[in-house]
Amino acid sequence: MNVGHIVSVIGVVVDVEFAPGQVPDIYSAVKIRTEDQEDKSTKWNLTLEVAQHLGNNRVRCIAMSSTEGLKRGMKVVSTGKAISVPVGRPVLGRLLNVLGEEADGLEPIKAEKYYPIHRPAPALVDQSTKAEMLETGIKVIDLMIPFLKGGKIGLFGGAGVGKTVIVMELINNIAKQHGGISVFAGVGERTREGNDLYHEMKEAGVLEKTIMVFGQMNEPPGARLRVGLTGLTMAEFFRDEEGADTLLFIDNIFRFTQAGSEVSALLGRMPSAVGYQPTLATEMGQLQERITSTRKGSVTSVQAIYVPADDLTDPAPANAFAHLDATVVLSRAISELGIYPAVDPLDSTSRILDPQVVGKEHYECARGVQSVLQRYKELQDIIAILGMDELSDEDKLTVARARKLQRFLSQPFHVAETFTGRPGKYVSLKDTIRSFNEILAGKHDALPEQAFYMAGAIEEVMENAKRIEAGA
């Protein structure tokens, strides 16, 4: 047994000295347990991860849980391997922490297989190059930013514009329709949201096909930095061993970066731009490159990415952009209009919005909607200064249509029924394209624009218009 002892504790960073020639490897796990200590009055079961070799047989470790009460001289045992977490069928339907330990108060997990959380990304030759669209039932996403099956999708937005609500709705729509295995990694987010999600999924009956891994806001940075890898490792097992199409939801990638920044400062690394860690791009790459689809199976990931101060050029969101197949940008200006989901259809992009993949009709419909909205955006300055009366008849019609399209891009969500008081709507891609084509063709120019707000397909808009007329 390889035993060392603590020589210093600074917050969550612990320096440990081992015997010469017995120094554990980088990324290997070391443990502080009650049975190894002389003083057994305090219960200890603390896992740390080796982050640096300091020389003189000393290593610098990051704790995965609270270091309160640690003293110099306490014994530390090296496990000789990286943090390993249970994988496979026994983990389904469970709520776990960063170490793969049960956090739902149910019986212990009896898993046959354990995987280390640090694993190489699949080789380029093993990766899949198939392009197929994944239907979500959310109009603005399916039409303007189609998701790639087995791709990486990022939801970018500042505080309070609805990232988590969209992630929840996607879980509701895709996990229920898809019927496959879903993994949810809660990285540094609110405990309340995790609790709500757990109970919602339990009620919806999708929990037995879901694994939930949490490293919440109140946990040390070590746990928040590694919980994304824990969730990913569990998803990789189903992709590689069972050839399954797995869904991976991560909320929030920014907190992963933030935890890395905290740890980096404690390790004494020189900060880079905006105070972030110098290894930001490497850390992001190590996580993102593993989220991929192979010839055996796929991992489709949906990642919420907080944008500090609504600045998309901040290094944390900017670094994530390069790895994604589709970027859904949520706009505060749109949320202020009361249009939810507050997706900016002009700023968001998808790699597969291409006639070769989605078909000519879908592509032309999406580009038609974009061009009307873009023209409206250009005219807004003129409207603000001179008013609507100064516009040509053609531009007046464009503005009227754009306002209808903008409102029609809103949609009532199943997970937000308690807030909106409206039943959620799942709109098929076929209905979405048909509805938008009719608006672009001018078939519904006579309908009032408020009829388009929070509707499903175009038939519901017509019903709303009749109701408004009857009420008037």
UniProtKB/Swiss-Prot annotation:
Keywords of the record: ATP synthesis, ATP-binding, Cell membrane, CF(1), Hydrogen ion transport, Ion transport, Membrane, Nucleotide-binding, Translocase, Transport
Protein name per the record: ATP synthase subunit beta
Pfam families: ATP-synt_ab (PF00006), ATP-synt_ab_N (PF02874), ATP-synt_VA_C (PF22919)
Class in the EC hierarchy, top level: translocase
Main location, first listed in the record: membrane
Gene: atpD
Entry-linked NCBIfam families: atpD (TIGR01039)
EC numbers, comma separated: 7.1.2.2
Binding site for ATP: 157-164
Subcellular location: Cell membrane
Assembly description: F-type ATPases have 2 components, CF(1) - the catalytic core - and CF(0) - the membrane proton channel. CF(1) has five subunits: alpha(3), beta(3), gamma(1), delta(1), epsilon(1). CF(0) has three main subunits: a(1), b(2) and c(9-12). The alpha and beta chains form an alternating ring which encloses part of the gamma chain. CF(1) is attached to CF(0) by a central stalk formed by the gamma and epsilon chains, while a peripheral stalk is formed by the delta and b chains.
Reactions performed catalytically: ATP + H2O + 4 H(+)(in) = ADP + phosphate + 5 H(+)(out)
Function: Produces ATP from ADP in the presence of a proton gradient across the membrane. The catalytic sites are hosted primarily by the beta subunits.
Species name: Desulforamulus reducens (strain ATCC BAA-1160 / DSM 100696 / MI-1)
GO molecular function term, any single one: ATP binding
PANTHER family noted in UniProt: ATP SYNTHASE, ATP SYNTHASE SUBUNIT BETA, MITOCHONDRIAL
